[in-house]
Swiss-Prot record:
Required during biogenesis of c-type cytochromes (cytochrome c6 and cytochrome f) at the step of heme attachment. It is found in: Plastid, Chloroplast thylakoid membrane. It comes from the Eukaryota. The keyword Thylakoid applies. This is Cytochrome c biogenesis protein CcsA. InterPro entries: Cyt_c_assembly, Cyt_c_biogenesis_CcsA, Cyt_c_biogenesis_CcsA/CcmC. GO terms for molecular function: heme binding. Belongs to the CcmF/CycK/Ccl1/NrfE/CcsA family. The chain crosses the membrane at residues 12-32, 45-65, 72-92, 100-120, 145-165, 234-254, 263-283, 296-316. It comes from Phaseolus vulgaris (Kidney bean).
Length: 328
């Protein structure tokens, strides 16, 4: 009873704090750095969230006697914890990435909100592990897969942001009433795109022959380039986690079911996810196809991850149906 009450308190504290953090972040985005204290409040709030979710997982671990990876509810809580870990790593490196803040806080809110919703009420009660899950591979496989999903989701959302910015600019240019302005904007963007980045200081010095739209295009391109760079790094890390998770899962499957691969729905979609992001990394290495093309592939990967992680669990089909929505 004590553990259940403590778990309930920690869940609601973390959920409430994250909800407040989203409001703080929106105010920061709208007002910039005019309110200095908000940035510190955001960091403190994320630290509180991290420790609350950590306490929640530890409490459930002690109460159940096994790692909290046995069902969809526990994996969602662990997923929200890995999102908070992602933020803590950035804090330790003292990097201020507002676009990561924009991604991480809603992700924690969504995962915790769904985990604590009425749909998964029956999973809140910790149960004894089924024989297939009573293995030392449980921690290795599940933790690597969840870490992979977390980093890949963050990287994919950065790619989605690139597509949104790009298509907004495209729609804006198409909406120009005069063809002259359309070509002017396009040529200005193309000219700045291929300029030597070492001449950045010279470019920032306003000259009579450069229009204001040129400065807007330059900063937009710089922002897209930064998003793409961080997205590539994040997805590369997530791809490593996903690869290790798939390999450890195959070894575990051989021990449990006598076969490394059974083309189970979960396994199939995990393989599709791996293929999608392998294609992304291949395209990203090609200078002619980077940015827009690689971002489209990564955005597809975002949807594929949710089908693999959440969709299959909700349907409750295949060998991975234990701990799913329909199996209860």
């Amino acid at each position: 009873m004590v553990f259940s009450t403590l778990e309930h308190i920690l869940t609601h504290i973390s959920f409430s704090v994250v909800s407040l953090l989203i409001s703080i972040h929106l105010i920061t985005l709208l007002l910039g750095n005019e309110i200095i204290g908000l940035d510190n409040s955001f960091k403190k709030g994320m630290i509180i969230t991290f420790f609350c979710i950590t306490g929640l997982l530890v409490t459930r671990w002690i109460f159940s006697g096994h790692l909290p990876f046995s069902n969809l509810y526990e994996s969602l809580i662990f997923l929200s914890w890995t999102f908070s870990i992602f933020y803590m790593v950035l804090c330790l490196k003292k990097k201020k990435n507002y676009y990561f803040n924009t991604i991480i806080t809603p992700s924690i809110l969504f995962t915790q909100g769904f985990a604590t919703s009425g749909l998964l009420t029956e999973m809140h009660q910790s149960l004894i592990l089924v024989p297939a899950l009573q293995s030392h591979w449980l921690m290795m496989h599940v933790s690597m897969m969840i870490l992979g999903y977390t980093t890949l989701l963050c990287g994919s959302l950065l790619s989605v942001a690139i597509l949104v910015i790009t298509f907004q600019e495209l729609i804006h240019m198409i909406g120009k009433s005069k063809t002259f302005f359309f070509f002017n904007e396009t040529l200005s963007f193309a000219e700045i795109k291929y300029m030597n980045m070492n001449d950045k200081k010279n470019l920032l010095q306003k000259t009579p022959f450069m229009s204001d739209s040129s400065y807007i295009n330059y900063y937009r391109y710089q922002f897209i380039q930064q998003l793409d760079r961080w997205g590539y790094r994040t997805i590369s890390l997530g791809f490593i986690f996903l690869t290790v998770g798939n390999i450890s899962g195959a070894v575990w499957a051989n021990e449990a079911w006598g076969s490394y691969w059974n083309w189970d729905p979960k396994e199939t979609w995990a393989f599709i996810t791996w293929i999608i992001f392998a294609i992304y990394l291949h395209i990203r290495k090609n200078k002619k196809l980077e940015y827009l093309n690689s971002s489209i592939v990564a955005s597809m990967g975002f949807l594929i991850i949710w089908i693999c992680y959440l969709g299959i669990n909700l349907l409750g089909i295949g060998l991975h149906s234990y701990g799913s929505f329909t199996s209860n």
